[in-house]
């Protein structure tokens, strides 16, 4: 197929076909300037925002929770993808010439798949954690060590999935330019290439979103559709509201990811249906737009955290306190709110099955941090996102529920 826009260095599914020596995809300067400004916004916002998210969590002891460790992994993957791939993708799509050599050609085809896999499965892990915390609150939670092991396994699987595309990546020198492409093994009807691309799309988009959708649907029904007992205390209502805020924030994160990446996946599946589309000159603008939307997903999460979570908002205000239009706020609250451990007796209503479990509680907080004080063996440590530590002693009386702000 001649005159195909060479997408072979793009994130993943490539059209590994013959490319012409001429370059028909030449844009006017004003278009390049506009696209450059749009992509610059992504890189700056994503890298700065995600680095601040990582700092907020790792620099504050009480923010080191199971959920937040997965958010660190998500932020790391997105910051790296924005820093190492967005600009290169843009320059190659605009000029249709590969300037970066063989090694970076392999890395450029390899790393984004791994980063995208790590991102979506970090969201899946958070959804599973929310599901277990709210639907099965008496089940043991992941420890800090187990959480790190899960993150390590996610990256190992991500690297294995991305390996074939990096391995078969190569550069090809033409009389007028160099292109980065993927030379898949010869096979009738490009079977290996099609199988790999479909497998990748399912594993890093459709499958995890299906799992996440199921988890949050069940959690949403539990938190919003079930009635709260009329005699529940104000503290208990606050606790349920806190759970809802966490779930709502993560649903926004996942929906943003799904919307941003859908056009990109569709774009790379279309050639298997109608290959002639890649012969059209307008396809370059379609690609730049779909890639911008996909890459922009890396910059939205820090904004979502800042808008929907009080602690992250405090952290961002402190990080940007040098800006004259930003008030630093009560920065001590980032630590203080999660360090209060009050002994109280609390009623826990299991709304999913309309059962009430009455327990003695020592210290209610968002999640038990990595190195936080441990509850006594006879206590049930309930958190504002529904998490719990077992070894409980059931009581026959209830009292107010003390809930902290969310992490």
Swiss-Prot record:
Lipid-conjugated positions (S-palmitoyl cysteine): 322
CC annotations in GO: cell body; cell periphery; cell surface; dendrite; plasma membrane; postsynaptic membrane; sperm flagellum; sperm head
Domain of life: Eukaryota
Annotated glycosylation sites: 14, 18
Cystine crosslinks: 105-180
Record topological domains on the Cytoplasmic side: 55-64, 129-148, 220-248, 309-407
Record Gene3D superfamilies: Rhodopsin 7-helix transmembrane proteins
Record GO terms (molecular function): substance P receptor activity
Cell location: Cell membrane
One of the Pfam families matching this protein, by short name: 7tm_1
Residue spans, topological domain Extracellular: 1-31, 87-106, 170-194, 271-283
SUPFAM superfamilies: Family A G protein-coupled receptor-like
Keywords from the UniProt entry: Cell membrane, Disulfide bond, G-protein coupled receptor, Glycoprotein, Lipoprotein, Membrane, Palmitate, Receptor, Transducer, Transmembrane, Transmembrane helix
GO biological process: aggressive behavior; angiotensin-mediated drinking behavior; associative learning; behavioral response to pain; eating behavior; learning or memory; long-term memory; neuropeptide signaling pathway
Function noted in UniProt: This is a receptor for the tachykinin neuropeptide substance P. It is probably associated with G proteins that activate a phosphatidylinositol-calcium second messenger system. The rank order of affinity of this receptor to tachykinins is: substance P > substance K > neuromedin-K.
PANTHER family (UniProt xref): G-PROTEIN COUPLED RECEPTOR TKR-1-RELATED, SUBSTANCE-P RECEPTOR
Family of this protein: Belongs to the G-protein coupled receptor 1 family.
Stated name of the protein: Substance-P receptor
Organism: Rattus norvegicus
């Amino acid at each position: 197929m001649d005159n195909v826009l060479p997408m072979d260095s793009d994130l993943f599914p490539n059209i590994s076909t013959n490319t012409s020596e001429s370059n028909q995809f030449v844009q006017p300067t004003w278009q390049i300037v506009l696209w450059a400004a749009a992509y610059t916004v992504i890189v700056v916002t994503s890298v700065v925002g995600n680095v601040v998210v990582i700092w907020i969590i790792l620099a504050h002891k009480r923010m080191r929770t199971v959920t937040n460790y997965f958010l660190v992994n998500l932020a790391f993957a997105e910051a790296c993808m924005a820093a190492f791939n967005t600009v290169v993708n843009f320059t190659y799509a605009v000029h249709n010439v590969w300037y970066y050599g063989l090694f970076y050609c392999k890395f450029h085809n390899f790393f984004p798949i791994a980063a995208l896999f790590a991102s979506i499965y970090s969201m899946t892990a958070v959804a599973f954690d929310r599901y277990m915390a709210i639907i099965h609150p008496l089940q043991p939670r992941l420890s800090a060590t187990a959480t790190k092991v899960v993150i390590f396994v996610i990256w190992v699987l991500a690297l294995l999935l991305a390996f074939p595309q990096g391995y078969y990546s190569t550069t090809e020198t033409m009389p007028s330019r160099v292109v980065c492409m993927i030379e898949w093994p010869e096979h009738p009807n490009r079977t290996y290439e099609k199988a790999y691309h479909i497998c990748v799309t399912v594993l890093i988009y459709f499958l995890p979103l299906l799992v996440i959708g199921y988890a949050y649907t069940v959690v949403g029904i539990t938190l919003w559709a079930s009635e709260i007992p009329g005699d529940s205390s104000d503290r208990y209502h606050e606790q349920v509201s806190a759970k809802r805020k966490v779930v709502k924030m993560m649903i926004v994160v996942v929906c943003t990811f799904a919307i941003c990446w859908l056009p990109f996946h569709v774009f790379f599946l279309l050639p298997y249906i109608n290959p002639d589309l890649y012969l059209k000159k307008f396809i370059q603008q379609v690609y730049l737009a779909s890639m911008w939307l996909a890459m922009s997903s890396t910059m939205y999460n820090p904004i979502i955290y800042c808008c929907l979570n009080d602690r992250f908002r405090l952290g961002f205000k402190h990080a940007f306190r040098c800006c004259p239009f930003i008030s630093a706020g009560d920065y001590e609250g980032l630590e203080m709110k999660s360090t209060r451990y009050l002994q109280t007796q609390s009623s826990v209503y299991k709304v999913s099955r309309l059962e009430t479990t009455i327990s003695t509680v020592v210290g209610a907080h968002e999640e038990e941090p990595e190195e936080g004080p441990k509850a006594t063996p006879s206590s049930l440590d309930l958190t504002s996102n529904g998490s719990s530590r077992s070894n409980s002693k059931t009581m026959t009386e209830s009292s107010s529920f003390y809930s902290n702000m969310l992490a």
